[in-house]
Amino acid sequence: MTIGIIGAMEEEVELLKNSMSSVEEIVIGGAKFYIGEIASKEVVLLESGIGKVNAALGTTLMADRFKPEVIINTGSAGGMAEGLAVGDVIISDRLAYGDVDVTEFGYTYGQVPRMPAFYQGDAVLLKKAETIYREYFATSENKAVYGLVVTNDSFIMRPDQHEIIRTFFPDVKAVEMEAAAIAQVAYQFDIPFLIIRAISDLANQEATISFDEFIHLAAKQSATCIIELLKTI
């Protein structure tokens, strides 16, 4: 089985890359692929670049050229739900776009025409993650939460951005800039996927400071959780 893992930034893939054995690097159209093994599993690790277009491009290249049987997205996210703290992990059971509006034609806010309104994380992978992380976080000050992640081509920190997202997605847990695009490509290629992100900021007016300070913590937390999951796949 080949497992695809995608992170947007160098910081988000560094720990995973350093955990790989027999690493081969390939660059295609600016997307950096690292091919090797983690936890005795064949892995294709992608540093895609930031934003939905980079994520979609890289995921498409991965799906077409490397044929992964599973795709996992790692990285950081901004927490939107009450009670979340930096270092908590969000496992997405659903994903949506927060900046797509074709409602005049009868679509749900966030829905790309002729695509689902929400992209569903793979139920089998979700179940495995839930079992693993219940034990993993039992003695930790952080926690794993499950729910809706919303993707925007903007860094969310202003009250007006919050208001729009909460109006259309009142149960949102976290926001970020790539996951729904990865999910859409995985959906179109019929590849099971799971989004595992760690909270780097609380998507508020201190978010830029928090992100810069805690991106490495969030990346480490997310990557560590993924390595634990790989041991069970």
From Swiss-Prot:
Active site per database record: 12, 201
Keywords: Amino-acid biosynthesis, Hydrolase, Methionine biosynthesis
Keyword ATP-binding assigned: no
Recorded GO CC terms: cytosol
Domain of life: Bacteria
Annotated substrate binding sites: 78, 156, 177-178
EC nos: 3.2.2.9
Pathway: Amino-acid biosynthesis; L-methionine biosynthesis via salvage pathway; S-methyl-5-thio-alpha-D-ribose 1-phosphate from S-methyl-5'-thioadenosine (hydrolase route): step 1/2
Reaction(s) catalysed (UniProt annotation): S-adenosyl-L-homocysteine + H2O = S-(5-deoxy-D-ribos-5-yl)-L-homocysteine + adenine; S-methyl-5'-thioadenosine + H2O = 5-(methylsulfanyl)-D-ribose + adenine; 5'-deoxyadenosine + H2O = 5-deoxy-D-ribose + adenine
Enzyme class: hydrolase
GO biological process, one term: L-methionine salvage from S-adenosylmethionine
Family statement: Belongs to the PNP/UDP phosphorylase family. MtnN subfamily.
Biological role: Catalyzes the irreversible cleavage of the glycosidic bond in both 5'-methylthioadenosine (MTA) and S-adenosylhomocysteine (SAH/AdoHcy) to adenine and the corresponding thioribose, 5'-methylthioribose and S-ribosylhomocysteine, respectively. Also cleaves 5'-deoxyadenosine, a toxic by-product of radical S-adenosylmethionine (SAM) enzymes, into 5-deoxyribose and adenine.
Protein name: 5'-methylthioadenosine/S-adenosylhomocysteine nucleosidase
